[in-house]
Amino acid sequence: MLSPIFGVLFDGIAYGMLLFVLSVGLSVTLGLMNFVNLAHCAFAMLGGYVTITLVNEFNWPFLATLPMAFAAAAVVSVALERTLYRRLYRATDLDQVLLTIGLAFISVSIAAYIFGTIQQPVETPEVLRGSVGFLGLDLGKYRLFLIGIALVVTVLLVTGLEYTRFGAQVRAAVVNQRMARGLGIDVDRTFASTFALGSGLAGLGGALAIEIVGLDPNFAFTYLVYVLIIVSVGGLGSIAGSFAAAILIGVSDVAGKYYAPELGAFLIYLVMVVVLMWRPAGLVGRR
């Protein structure tokens, strides 16, 4: 009787962990740098296509492509940060939205031209296929892998941004750039590193997403909605908030599609509205 419920809960948590990896980078750049980057999921799409290309064209092992997906998205983001984004740090939100949504449209067109409009499969290693039994439940190995990756990312991000010199430099640069420069902090390099980190995590998420939700050129817009919901519900700049929001949205989405498929994705929007009415700054947002 309870097995289907626990099965849905497990799938929802695993899906939520995928959404967390996709969204936490935007939470960092938007919350800490106050930059609205609607091209965030374009970097996720880039990471996914890097993995597809390396696996299908060059016979790389799937796991070996994950660092490359992170690195490719990070490098491209640094190039864009130095040439385009940096000019708009002090611009209005509308200017930032127009630039980044334009970049997202461009990325979709390029992906469709190069890779086509259909989803492309990728072969995962044998160790991540199938399921393992636990208390009468069949837990997918790949979903367990996703949960493990998300937990590692969470620990590394919290440690890096809260307890290291780099994290202190990022916060100082955001609060007062002039004072930060006076203290010897290279603000431009700090912002570029932060952008690379956020976009690299998106690239990693895009690579991990292929096995669960597939990848096509519309990915940049389809999952941008989920990412923005998680960042809003969790609270800007809060890693813990994004983690909690991702679990909440993931479980709500999977449960809604399983128990009330006629509602579609309506349930996650309802959850978002209820949470933001209760806590307008998000679950762990700054008031």
Language-model regions, residue ranges each:
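Membrane-interfacial amphipathic/re-entrant helices at transmembrane-helix boundaries
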Residues: 1-22, 50, 61-65, 91-97, ...
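Inter-helical junctions in multi-pass inner-membrane proteins, predominant
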Residues: 2-18, 160-165, 191-233, 253-265
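Membrane-embedded helix boundary and interhelical linker motif in transport proteins
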Residues: 10, 32-79, 83
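Helix-loop-helix "hairpin" substructures at the membrane interface of multi-pass membrane proteins
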Residues: 15, 134, 138-215, 239-245
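Short, non-helical or kinked segments that cap or interrupt transmembrane helices
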Residues: 26-47, 62, 90-96, 166-169, ...
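Alpha-helical transmembrane segments within multi-pass membrane transporters and channels
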Residues: 59-104, 110, 244-249, 279-280
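Cytosolic-side transmembrane-helix boundaries in multi-pass membrane proteins
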Residues: 83, 114, 175-182, 186-189, ...
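Transmembrane helix-bundle core of multi-pass membrane transporters
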Residues: 88, 92-163, 190-193, 255, ...
